C-alpha cells in the first residue's frame, strides 16, 4: 500500500499554478509522472501523490522540473481564474476511479494520435524522398538521352560531311574526265584535219594532167567528203571460258559438298537485298550498297566512333540480313560499348550464318566464338565463355593469344570452385 504524500506546497496566479512536491530521498530514476487536464499523479515508491485538479489545465504546455530532491510543476490553466483549492473536494472513490480511467483513456488516445501523426510524417518524408529520387533518376535518364542524341547528331554530321566530301570528289573526277574527253576530241579533230590535208595533197598530185573545168573543185570536194567517212566495222565474237574456283584443301580432307553449299549461300546473300525501306529514297546509290556501308562502319570503328559504326551496320543489315560479317563487326562495337547481351546475340547470329563450317569461313567463326566468349566472361559466365574459347582453339589451335586467354579463364573457374 503506497503512502499518500500530503506535505506539498502550491501557489497560483490567474493563469499558472506552481506545485512543489518533495521526493523524500527517492531516486529520480524511480519517479513516474502522469498528467492530464484534470488529473496529476506522481508515483515514487513507496510514496504516491494524486491530485484531482480543481479546473482543467493545458497538459501539453505544462512543465515539471526535478532538482534538489524536489519536483516543481508549472501548470498552465485553460481558463484564467483563481482556484479555491488544488484538488476537488468531496469526491468519492467511484468518482476518483472514473477520473483515473478517463485520464488513462485520454492519454492513450493522445499517444495513439501522436503515433499516427508520426507515422504520417514518416510516410510523407518517404514520399518526398521517393519523389526526389525519381526526379534525380529522371534527370540522369534525360542526361543520358541527351548524350545519346548529341552522339547521334555528331555521327550524322560526320556522315553528311563525309558524303559531301565524296560528292565533291566525284564531281572533281567527273570534271577531270570531261576535260580529258575534250582534249581527246580536240586531238581527234586535229588528226582528221591532218588526214584531210594529206588526202587533198595526194589527189592534187594525181590529177595534175586532168583537164580543169568549171565544176572540178565541187567534184573534188564531194569526193573528199565521201573518202572521209569511215567504213562500218566488221562484226566479230569472243568466246570466254571461266576458270572454276578451286579450294586449297587436300583431296583426302576435302569437303566439296560443304564448300559448294557455302559458295551458294554467299551468292544468295549478295543477291538478298531489301529495298522496301523508307530511308532509301534520301540516299545515294552507293549508300544503298551493304558492302559500302560495311566499309564505312569499319572506318568509323577504327576511329573509335562506335555508335556511328553501329548505325552504319544497322542500315546494312536492314538492306541485307544474310551477311555474317555485318553481325560479327557489330558485335565488336557492342563489346566496346559494354552492350554485352547484344554482343552475344550478334555473335550467335554470325555463327548461324557461317554455316556450314569450311576453311573459307574459319577465321570469321573463330572471331565470333572469341567475341561471344569475351561477352560471357564480362558477364561473369566463365564456363560459357571457356566453351567458346575452346571452340575457337579447335578452329585455330596455334593462336597464342586465344590460348593464353583460355588458360586465364580456366584459372578463374578453378579459383571460384575452390572458394565455394
Swiss-Prot record:
Superkingdom, natural source: Eukaryota
Protein name, per record: Dynein axonemal assembly factor 4
Entry function: Involved in neuronal migration during development of the cerebral neocortex. May regulate the stability and proteasomal degradation of the estrogen receptors that play an important role in neuronal differentiation, survival and plasticity. Axonemal dynein assembly factor required for ciliary motility.
Keywords assigned: Cell projection, Cytoplasm, Neurogenesis, Nucleus, Repeat, TPR repeat
Subunit-structure text: Interacts with ZMYND10. Interacts with STUB1. Interacts with ESR1 and ESR2. Interacts with DNAAF2. Interacts with CCT3, CCT4, CCT5 and CCT8. Interacts with DNAAF6/PIH1D3.
TPR repeat residue intervals: 290-323, 324-357, 366-399
Residue ranges, annotated region (Mediates interaction with ESR1 and STUB1): 7-103
The keyword Lipid metabolism is annotated on this UniProt entry: no
A molecular function GO annotation: nuclear estrogen receptor binding
A Pfam family annotated for this UniProt entry: CS
Main subcellular location: nucleus
Biological processes per GO annotation: determination of left/right symmetry; epithelial cilium movement involved in extracellular fluid movement; establishment of localization in cell; heart development; inner dynein arm assembly; learning or memory; neuron migration; outer dynein arm assembly
Gene3D superfamilies: 2.60.40.790, Tetratricopeptide repeat domain (1.25.40.10)
One GO CC term, this protein: cytoplasm
InterPro entries named among the record's database cross-references: CS_dom, CS_DYX1C1, Dynein_assembly_factor_4, HSP20-like_chaperone, TPR-like_helical_dom_sf, TPR_rpt
Domain CS per the UniProt entry, residue ranges: 3-87
Compartment(s) where it occurs, according to its Swiss-Prot or TrEMBL record: Nucleus; Cytoplasm; Cell projection, Neuron projection; Dynein axonemal particle
Family annotation (SMART domains): TPR
Protein source organism: Gorilla gorilla gorilla (Western lowland gorilla)
Amino acid at each position: 500500500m503506497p503512502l499518500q504524500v500530503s506535505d506539498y506546497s502550491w501557489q497560483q496566479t490567474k493563469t499558472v499554478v506552481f506545485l512543489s512536491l518533495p521526493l523524500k530521498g527517492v531516486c529520480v530514476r524511480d519517479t513516474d509522472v502522469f498528467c492530464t487536464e484534470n488529473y496529476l499523479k506522481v508515483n515514487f515508491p513507496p510514496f504516491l501523490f494524486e491530485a484531482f485538479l480543481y479546473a482543467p489545465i493545458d497538459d501539453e504546455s505544462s512543465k515539471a522540473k526535478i532538482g534538489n530532491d524536489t519536483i516543481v510543476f508549472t501548470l498552465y490553466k485553460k481558463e484564467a481564474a483563481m482556484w479555491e483549492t488544488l484538488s476537488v473536494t468531496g469526491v468519492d472513490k467511484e468518482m476518483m476511479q472514473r477520473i483515473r480511467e478517463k485520464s488513462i483513456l485520454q492519454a492513450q488516445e493522445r499517444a495513439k494520435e501522436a503515433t499516427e501523426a508520426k507515422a504520417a510524417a514518416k510516410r510523407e518524408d518517404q514520399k518526398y524522398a521517393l519523389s526526389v529520387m525519381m526526379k534525380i533518376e529522371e534527370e540522369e535518364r534525360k542526361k543520358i538521352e541527351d548524350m545519346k542524341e548529341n552522339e547521334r547528331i555528331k555521327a550524322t554530321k560526320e556522315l553528311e560531311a563525309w558524303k559531301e566530301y565524296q560528292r565533291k570528289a566525284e564531281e572533281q573526277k567527273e570534271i577531270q574526265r570531261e576535260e580529258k574527253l575534250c582534249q581527246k576530241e580536240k586531238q581527234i579533230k586535229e588528226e582528221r584535219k591532218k588526214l584531210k590535208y594529206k588526202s587533198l595533197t595526194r589527189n592534187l598530185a594525181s590529177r595534175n594532167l586532168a583537164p580543169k573545168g568549171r565544176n572540178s573543185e565541187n567534184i573534188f570536194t564531194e569526193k573528199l567528203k565521201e573518202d572521209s567517212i569511215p567504213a562500218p566495222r566488221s562484226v566479230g565474237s569472243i568466246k570466254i571460258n571461266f576458270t572454276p574456283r578451286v579450294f586449297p584443301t587436300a583431296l583426302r580432307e576435302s569437303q566439296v559438298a560443304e564448300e559448294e553449299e557455302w559458295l551458294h549461300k554467299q551468292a544468295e546473300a549478295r543477291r538478298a537485298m531489301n529495298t522496301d525501306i523508307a530511308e532509301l529514297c534520301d540516299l545515294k546509290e552507293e549508300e544503298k550498297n551493304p558492302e559500302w556501308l560495311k566499309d564505312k562502319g569499319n572506318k568509323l570503328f577504327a576511329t573509335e566512333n562506335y555508335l556511328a559504326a553501329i548505325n552504319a551496320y544497322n542500315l546494312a543489315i536492314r538492306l541485307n540480313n544474310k551477311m555474317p560479317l555485318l553481325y560479327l563487326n557489330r558485335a565488336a562495337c557492342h563489346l566496346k560499348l559494354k552492350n554485352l547481351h547484344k554482343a552475344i546475340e550478334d555473335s550467335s547470329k554470325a555463327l548461324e550464318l557461317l554455316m556450314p563450317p569450311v576453311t573459307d569461313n574459319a577465321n570469321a567463326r573463330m572471331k565470333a566464338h572469341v567475341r561471344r566468349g569475351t561477352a560471357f566472361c564480362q558477364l561473369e559466365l566463365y564456363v560459357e565463355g571457356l566453351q567458346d574459347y575452346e571452340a575457337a582453339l579447335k578452329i585455330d589451335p596455334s593462336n597464342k593469344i586465344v590460348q593464353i586467354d583460355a588458360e586465364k579463364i580456366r584459372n578463374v573457374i578453378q579459383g571460384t570452385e575452390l572458394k565455394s
